[in-house]
């Protein structure tokens, strides 16, 4: 299962690596020594799990082809379930925990972390609720502000570590609430960029589920629906990857008999539908968003050279 070319390039022997196993495979048991160190019972099954983002998607109900998850966390993850292999260098591709399924996915290096940075450095005395309320009173498009959310470079889909964050269109008219809304819109444009790549691969999700801290933001949820032009379902009380990992262990040890039983632990809250008129505004702004990056790519390269 290990890639020989990569191992040879790194000078690593396959003998030094563990055996690759499918999720929900019992690969051993807790030894007596490990039991003393951890407090677990000796003989407890040790089960192969999955990557955290895969377990998190599974535990949000992303388990049928076309299901899509948008994670509004410190970074921004977007995952779509497939029953066939679609390989594209702009995206990541992982096995699902369910045999025969895959998760094509992307990760934006910064998402909610930009909001945290703004709140701590530029928002003055405003708390998050005040920013929400004021941001809701700003029209879609933030009155001419467009943000590139590349504050740590960017992973997918542009794969450009030299890209930088950018706020285009500032005037003396703009206030903190304009910038706050522009941040949410810029992050949502990043997710839309991923969906456009999905569509190039003939993957067309028609709805999305939202999780993580950003799913508690009234404004961010609404902007996400309007920018993506699809209904978004909010997963309530989602514990993240821990639920997925626990279920995988339970499936391996006979607590659960089918993968579908995960559904009984998933609670869907509100569903937010896009506003067609607002979506039209965002379509035009997304084109500008993409143009800003393309026209400044060489500038980002020069800034990289100066700062390193």
How would you label these PLM feature ranges?
Residues 15-23, 104:
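A glycine-/small-polar-enriched, mobile loop at the entrance of the PLP active site in fold-type I
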Residues 1-10, 26-28, 32-308:
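Active-site core segments that coordinate phosphate-bearing ligands/cofactors
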């Amino acid at each position: 299962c290990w890639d020989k070319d990569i191992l040879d390039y790194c000078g690593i022997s396959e003998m030094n690596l563990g055996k690759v196993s499918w999720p929900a495979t019992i690969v051993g048991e807790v030894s007596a020594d490990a039991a003393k160190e951890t407090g677990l019972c000796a003989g407890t099954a040790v089960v192969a799990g999955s990557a955290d983002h895969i377990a998190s998607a599974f535990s949000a109900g992303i388990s049928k082809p076309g299901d899509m998850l948008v994670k509004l966390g410190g970074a921004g993850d977007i995952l779509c379930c497939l029953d066939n292999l679609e390989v594209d260098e702009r995206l990541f591709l992982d096995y699902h925990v369910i045999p025969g399924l895959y998760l094509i996915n992307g990760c934006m290096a910064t998402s909610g972390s930009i909001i945290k940075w703004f709140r701590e450095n530029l928002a003055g005395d405003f708390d998050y609720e005040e920013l929400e309320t004021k941001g809701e009173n700003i029209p879609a498009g933030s009155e001419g502000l467009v943000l590139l959310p590349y504050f740590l470079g960017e992973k997918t889909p542009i794969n450009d570590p030299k890209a930088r964050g950018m706020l285009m269109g500032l005037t003396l008219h703009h206030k903190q609430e304009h910038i706050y809304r522009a941040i949410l819109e810029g992050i949502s444009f990043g997710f839309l960029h991923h969906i456009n790549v999905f569509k190039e691969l003939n993957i067309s999700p028609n709805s999305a589920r939202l999780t993580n801290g950003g799913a508690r933001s009234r404004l961010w949820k609404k902007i996400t629906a309007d920018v993506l032009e699809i209904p978004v379902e909010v997963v309530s009380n989602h514990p993240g990857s821990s639920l997925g990992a626990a279920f995988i262990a339970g499936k391996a040890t006979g607590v659960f008999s089918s993968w579908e039983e995960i559904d009984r632990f998933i609670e869907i809250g509100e569903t937010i539908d896009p506003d067609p008129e607002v979506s039209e505004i965002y379509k035009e702004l997304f084109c500008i968003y993409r143009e800003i990056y393309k026209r400044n790519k060489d500038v980002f390269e020069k800034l990289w050279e100066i700062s390193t």
